[in-house]
């Protein structure tokens, strides 16, 4: 099944509008290219509606939030909704500051999102309007573990039902859920946390996958999460004694570029709940 989702990205090569952050914008663009889609990175309010119109999907990331881009995100999101385009939200660091929390919640109120992708702290912040986010990493009390997986899945399904979006909670164990079904994904490698922007890259990748698979947002988002985790595993095997996190970042992008749909199908490690 995930092979089909990935093959559709390669065949259709959707154009993805990214309003993302300046820390990871280059990596996000290269990740979109690596999977077979095409990126546009445009965040000026004067043009975002035009850019969104010519694209197939929209990825909104609040990582380096400022007052100028807030307007751009809202305008692009509403335009994408009017056009029926899928929209992904990455609420980076929601809960770490009042501005981030207020903006993430405002976006959720004013834009219909196809997928919401974040760590457990960020997603809990969206659900409650307040949080205990530690930087842009999940708070230690908010790690998804085997012991609390059932409750985390129930939370993800409930939030998906409330928002109408697929909810992708990523961490050591990833959860991708709609109101009725959840994928619990165990791909990935711990070293992925040593690179800034793997989550941002995943959100851009997710936008490409859901855009190429209309009507199948849950499966497409799960396929993207599996692909990113599998790329982390493949990339780690390439590391030599002299390689560090910069090499690892490049190897992850290379792994997506070289990954076949069949390789994803075989390597995806998940269960359905």
Could you tell me what each predicted segment is?
Residues 28-31, 203-210, 221-224, 252, ...:
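Buried hydrophobic packing segments
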Residues 1-41:
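Glycine-rich phosphate/adenosyl-contacting loop at the front of the ribokinase-like
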Residues 100-182:
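Conserved phosphate/ATP/ADP-binding segment of small-molecule kinases
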Residues 69-118:
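Glycine/small-residue-rich loop that forms an oxyanion/phosphate-binding "nest" at active or ligand-binding sites
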Residues 230-273:
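Charged C-terminal helix
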Residues 31-89:
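Active-site cofactor/substrate anionic-group-binding motifs, chiefly glycine-
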Residues 196, 206-248:
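Conserved post-catalytic alpha-helical subdomain immediately downstream of the catalytic base
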Residues 185-196:
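Short pre-catalytic strand/loop immediately N-terminal to key active-site residues, enriched for Gly-Thr
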């Amino acid at each position: 099944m995930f092979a089909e989702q990935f093959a559709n990205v390669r065949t259709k090569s959707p154009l993805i509008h990214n309003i993302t952050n300046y820390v990871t914008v280059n990596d996000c663009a290269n990740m979109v290219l690596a999977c077979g889609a095409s990126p546009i990175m445009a965040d000026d309010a004067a043009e975002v509606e035009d850019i969104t119109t010519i694209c197939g999907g929209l990825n909104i990331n609040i990582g380096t939030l400022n007052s100028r881009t807030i307007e751009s995100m809202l305008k692009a999101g509403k335009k994408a909704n009017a056009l029926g385009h899928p929209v992904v939200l990455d609420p980076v660091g929601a809960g770490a500051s009042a501005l981030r929390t207020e903006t993430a919640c405002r976006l959720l109120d004013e834009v219909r999102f196809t997928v919401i992708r974040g760590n457990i702290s960020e997603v809990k912040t969206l659900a409650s309007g307040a949080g205990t986010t530690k930087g842009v990493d999940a708070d230690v009390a908010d790690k998804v573990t085997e012991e609390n997986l059932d409750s985390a899945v129930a939370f993800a399904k409930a939030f998906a039902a409330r928002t109408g979006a697929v909810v992708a909670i990523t961490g050591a164990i990833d959860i991708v859920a709609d109101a009725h079904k959840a994928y619990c994904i165990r791909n990935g490698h711990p070293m992925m946390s040593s690179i800034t922007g793997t989550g941002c890259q995943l959100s851009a990748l997710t936008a490409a996958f859901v855009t190429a698979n209309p009507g199948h947002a849950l499966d497409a988002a799960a396929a993207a999460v599996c692909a990113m985790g599998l790329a982390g595993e493949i990339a780690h095997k390439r590391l030599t004694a002299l390689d560090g996190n910069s090499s690892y970042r490049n190897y992850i992008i290379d792994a997506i570029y070289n990954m076949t749909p069949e390789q994803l199908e075989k390597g995806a490690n998940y269960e359905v709940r």
